[in-house]
Amino acid sequence: YAYWYSSFNRQPSPQLEVGSMLPGFEVLDIAGRTVNSGSFNDRPTIWIFHRGNWCPLCMAQIKEVASQYRDIQAMGVRVALVSPQSHKYTIDLAQRLDVPFEFMTDVCNRAAKTLGIDPPCGLPMGMQVLGYDSDTVLPTVVITEQGGRIVWAHETDNYRVRPEPEIYLDVLRDKGLIVPAT
């Protein structure tokens, strides 16, 4: 029951195949400016697509990554947290965590649609009352190298299972993606 209940029954997105380029998309940064995903190609990037502040498992995952921010920063790697939640919730998350990550709002879930990680009407019933949109994103982590090529992707099929931050660090080391921070 527990595994069945928490399964997304998802298929891997063909847009996130290792070795391919991360498709281009636009999101808003916390200042409300439109940012193109290609602007992250200057350094390796850990992209964490999360459902929003309402999801306790997403928040646990993000807090674990935030606790490792010094190690990640020392590697010269960017972290982009992307969610389709309301922009005010993204700003709130950035203020609460106070780490040098890129906090992004995926307006109308356009980035998730581009990447094939958008389950229509995936938000639990009742969350709309709190200002969340009915559509959400499937929790996904993508690591891109400098230039935007995908070197690793985790598309969980069980919303309770997320990779630990050490896995990201191991991938970055194993792929030789450490760029000393300046």
How should each PLM-predicted stretch be described?
Residues S37-V65:
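Short active-site neighborhood of thiol/selenol oxidoreductases, capturing the structured segment around
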Residues Y1-N9:
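Transmembrane alpha-helices
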Residues L22-P23, P44, L138-T140:
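Short loop/turn microsegments at loop-to-beta-strand junctions
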Residues A60-A112:
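Structural microenvironment flanking redox-active thiols in thiol-disulfide oxidoreductases
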Residues Q128-T182:
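Thiol-/selenol-based redox modules, centered on thioredoxin-like
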Residues N9-G38:
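N-terminal "domain-start" segment that seeds a small globular fold
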Residues G38, L115, W152-H154:
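Short hydrophobic alpha-helix segments
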Residues A94-L138:
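Short, internal strand/loop/helix patches
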